[in-house]
């Protein structure tokens, strides 16, 4: 009997997330069949890689949150890294990010830029206290 298609098969998700919220959201997408590409910084990647190290320095948390994903290292502080990200986003369906509010805008990657690049892109922004309001800059 053929395996039924997963509900998110055919969707491309780009994850700009660290620790829990962003990686958890994209992991669910991956489990439901989406292609997920996790973008990590060159300064050690997602800190989750180092949480509760087990055998040979690996992290159970990392293995749980990173499964079924591809991973790519990009330095978004450099134009070349931002250009590669833009190429990935040009045909992506979903962007999941959990930076503090304003980080993507400071990098020149705010919603206005990304929407002009790919009008059908869905952007999921996860932060501890939302994107606006008096507590927006508080860590989550």
Located regions from the model:
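N-terminal helix-loop segment corresponding to the beta1-alpha1 unit
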Residues: 1-140
């Amino acid at each position: 009997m053929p395996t039924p298609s997963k509900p998110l098969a055919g969707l491309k998700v780009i994850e700009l997330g660290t620790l829990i919220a962003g990686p958890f959201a994209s992991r669910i997408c991956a489990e439901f069949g989406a292609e997920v590409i996790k973008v990590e910084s060159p300064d050690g990647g997602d800190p989750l890689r180092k949480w509760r190290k087990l055998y040979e320095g690996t992290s159970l948390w990392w293995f749980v949150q990173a499964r079924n994903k591809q991973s790519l290292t990009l330095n978004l502080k450099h134009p070349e890294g931002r250009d590669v990200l833009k190429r990935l986003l040009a045909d992506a369906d979903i962007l999941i990010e959990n930076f503090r509010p304003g980080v993507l805008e400071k990098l020149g990657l705010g919603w206005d830029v990304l929407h002009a690049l790919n009008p059908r892109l869905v952007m999921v922004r996860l932060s501890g206290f939302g994107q606006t309001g008096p507590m927006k800059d508080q860590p989550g």
